[in-house]
Amino acid sequence: MKKIDIKILDSRLKDQLPAYATSGSAGLDLRACIEHVMTIQPGEAHLIPTGIAIHLSDPGLAALVLPRSGLGHKHGIVMGNLVGLIDSDYQGQIFVSCWNRGQAPFLLNPLERIAQLVVVPVVQVGFKVVDDFEQSERGANGFGSTGKH
């Protein structure tokens, strides 16, 4: 298992570091490091601190901040930016944009799990300018072109 540097910015997390829930989990839960219960009204979005900072340091890695499926499905709480991208050289606190797309106010409790962090490999590329591409089977056929079923 690869190790990355983590900085605890909120002392309440000392005993609750992000961890994989099961041996097959891809995401590490991120928590809302807020002092009091916060009400997120329908249509509102708030930046929520997670109380941690990470430094991946390896340009071959990035981290994705993804929504928790239960919050979105049951309560309409999703990420305002849909997906967060943390570059390998970022060292600041991780924040989560929580957007209430539901119809009812949502009460966010201190230290509630609000998102997942997934570390992924990254390939940096360069571009070679060409006049034409070698023909592929699909070509330029886009949206819906591969069929419905």
From Swiss-Prot:
Catalyzed reaction equations: dUTP + H2O = dUMP + diphosphate + H(+)
CDD domains, alphabetized: trimeric_dUTPase
Database matches in InterPro entries: dUTPase (IPR008181), dUTPase-like (IPR029054), dUTPase-like_sf (IPR036157), dUTPase_trimeric (IPR033704)
GO molecular function: dUTP diphosphatase activity; magnesium ion binding
Any Pfam family: dUTPase
Cofactor: Mg(2+)
GO biological process, one term: dUMP biosynthetic process
The protein's annotated pathway: Pyrimidine metabolism; dUMP biosynthesis; dUMP from dCTP (dUTP route): step 2/2
UniProt binding sites for substrate: R68, S69, G70, N81, L85, I86, D87
Function, as annotated: This enzyme is involved in nucleotide metabolism: it produces dUMP, the immediate precursor of thymidine nucleotides and it decreases the intracellular concentration of dUTP so that uracil cannot be incorporated into DNA.
NCBIfam families xref list: dut, PRK00601.1
PANTHER family (alphabetical): DEOXYURIDINE 5'-TRIPHOSPHATE NUCLEOTIDOHYDROLASE
Family membership: Belongs to the dUTPase family.
Protein name per UniProt: Deoxyuridine 5'-triphosphate nucleotidohydrolase
Organism: Nitrosospira multiformis (strain ATCC 25196 / NCIMB 11849 / C 71)
Gene assigned in the entry: dut
